[in-house]
């Protein structure tokens, strides 16, 4: 007899292998079997405290089962830190929409999504929206999309334009803010004023991600305490050098990956 965790709950079992265990539990050959964070149908010897999941394909697991699966995928300590993280994304265009989706998929527990704009056709070349979203506020469309990816995280939306007046009150309960504006003026305003009001919060900005070409020129740099910039610092959007999906996504990946690293290392 050994004790394992099955779908997030402790269970005593006499079965010695995963095949014996799942064939006794699962009545549908299409069910997904997950052992210690990995989906597999191989026959593996079971050990004390193994984490096992049997999930019906094409259905949403209950909240506790999904949470337990993500803990197994990420390792428990990391998952708990991400789940307790509070992150704001400012600007929900090509950068911000993908940053928010990355963080939702990773299990960040609270997202504050801020933008004033609506979705229009020119956004579709790089932003995480669909034709069916045209005319919707980006905040509302992105919340709807994220709710279909991870319905168990908390999402707050603010459909407004950030300025020096409202900046001082928007991020009082936020650990990390991702700046993802299109406007150079808005970027400068955020970089110059954010730490006047939030000395202990982290700001991650973006600069230089337009065009195509060298992927590795996009880097993450620490500029000062609690202040980071992702991008190549050179290629801004301009006439003849527009924003294109691949490099925008690379930069969004840098920003969202840095969020995970910072939350993981948070004391």
Where does each model-flagged region fall?
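Glycine-rich phosphate/adenylate-binding loop
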Residues: 23, 31-38, 56, 172-176, ...
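Glycine-rich phosphate-binding loop and adjoining beta1-alpha1-beta2 segment
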Residues: 115-150
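Short acidic beta-strand-loop surface patches of small beta-rich interaction domains
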Residues: 7, 31-46
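N-terminal charged helix/coil linker that caps or initiates catalytic domains
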Residues: 42, 47-48, 53-86
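Eukaryote-biased recognition of intrinsically disordered, low-complexity regulatory segments
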Residues: 1-11
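Glycine-rich adenosine-cofactor-binding loop
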Residues: 78-115
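Short amphipathic, charge-patterned alpha-helical segments
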Residues: 15-27
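A structured beta-alpha segment of the ubiquitous adenosine-cofactor-binding alpha/beta core
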Residues: 139-174, 181-183
């Amino acid at each position: 007899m050994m004790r394992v965790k099955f779908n997030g709950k402790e269970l005593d079992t006499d079965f010695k292998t995963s095949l014996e265990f799942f064939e006794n539990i699962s009545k549908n050959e299409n069910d997904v079997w997950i052992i210690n964070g990995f989906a597999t149908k191989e026959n593996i010897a079971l050990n004390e405290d193994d984490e096992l999941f049997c999930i019906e394909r094409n259905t949403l697991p209950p909240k506790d089962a999904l949470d337990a699966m993500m803990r197994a995928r990420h390792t428990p300590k990391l998952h708990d830190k991400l789940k307790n993280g509070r992150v704001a994304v400012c600007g929900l265009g090509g950068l911000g929409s993908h940053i928010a989706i990355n963080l939702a998929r990773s299990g960040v527990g609270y997202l504050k999504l801020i933008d004033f704009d609506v979705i229009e056709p020119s956004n579709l070349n790089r932003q995480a929206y669909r034709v069916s979203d045209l005319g919707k506020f980006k905040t509302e469309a992105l919340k709807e999309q994220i709710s279909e990816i991870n319905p168990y995280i908390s999402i707050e939306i603010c459909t407004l334009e950030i300025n020096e007046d409202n900046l001082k009150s928007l991020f009082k309960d936020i650990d990390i803010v991702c700046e993802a504006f299109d406007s150079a003026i808005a970027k400068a305003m955020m970089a110059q004023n954010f730490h006047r009001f939030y000395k202990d919060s982290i700001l991650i900005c973006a600069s230089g991600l337009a065009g195509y070409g060298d992927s590795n020129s996009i880097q993450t740099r620490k500029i000062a305490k609690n202040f980071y910039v992702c991008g190549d610092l050179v290629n801004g959007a301009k006439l003849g050098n527009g924003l294109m999906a691949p490099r925008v996504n690379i930069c969004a990946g840098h920003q969202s990956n840095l969020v995970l690293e910072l939350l993981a290392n948070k004391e």
